[in-house]
């Protein structure tokens, strides 16, 4: 599959990670930084969506529409706040509601601690001409990269209304993987310090 990285960029035309007409696509479009995508339609592939992934590493982005993505992964930055919107779609290119039916949706916070509390709600997608989605979307972070080592882990409930896809924080907990790493690092430092003390006592230092 192909990968397109859009970082701190301005794009006004269509963006397509692939144009194949058969087989699995497995393309990735990654958006980060202060990207301006007004009127741009973002395609995982022109004809197929199998394996295609949209990665959102930022918030406050406006685009024309998205199409042909099997996976929608939202990596919320640590400056995300209650009430923020990640992706706004004006829908003008197609003139129809945005369709994300059947998409695997994953939401996680990356980087440092975010100022989110249980009950806070983030709008992942605001589709101005309407949103067609599964009745009960579920947060599935399988396949999301770079979220295992963060110190806090946020749980999200997903919900929709006729124009929006929401993620509401349902829990905030310490990541046991990050705790294990921290304890291992502290143990290593203690071992180094102990070794230095033994060397000093032996008159070697």
Question: Where are the regions that the model predicts?
Answer:
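Extracellular beta-strand/loop-rich repeat segments of large surface/secreted proteins
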Residues: 20-121
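Outer-membrane translocation/initiation segment of Type V secreted surface proteins
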Residues: 111-205
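Short loop/turn motifs at secondary-structure junctions
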Residues: 10-11, 25, 36, 50, ...
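A detector of tandem-repeat and repeat-rich interaction/domain scaffolds
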Residues: 1-7, 13, 27, 31
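Well-ordered, non-membrane alpha-helical segments in soluble/globular domains
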Residues: 3, 28, 83-93, 132, ...
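Per-repeat structural element of leucine-rich repeats
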Residues: 13-14, 39
């Amino acid at each position: 599959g192909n990968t397109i990285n859009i970082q701190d960029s301005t794009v006004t035309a269509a963006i397509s990670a692939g144009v194949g007409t058969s087989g699995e696509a497995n393309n990735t479009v990654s958006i980060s930084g202060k990207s301006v995508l007004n009127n741009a339609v973002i395609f995982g592939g022109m004809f197929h969506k199998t394996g295609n992934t949209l990665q959102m590493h930022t918030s406050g982005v406006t685009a024309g529409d998205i199409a042909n993505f099997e996976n929608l992964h939202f990596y919320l930055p640590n400056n995300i706040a209650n009430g923020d919107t990640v992706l706004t779609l004006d829908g003008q290119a197609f003139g129809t509601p945005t369709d994300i039916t059947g998409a695997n949706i994953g939401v996680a916070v990356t980087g440092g601690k975010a100022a989110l509390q249980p009950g806070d709600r983030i709008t992942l997608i605001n589709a101005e001409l309407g949103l067609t989605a599964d009745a009960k979307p579920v947060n599935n972070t399988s396949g999301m990269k770079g979220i295992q080592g963060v110190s806090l882990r946020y749980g999200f409930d997903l919900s929709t209304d006729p124009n929006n896809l929401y993620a509401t924080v349902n829990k905030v907990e310490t990541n046991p993987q990050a705790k294990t790493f921290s304890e291992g690092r502290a143990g290593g430092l203690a071992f180094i310090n102990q070794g230095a003390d033994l060397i000093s006592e032996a008159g070697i230092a």
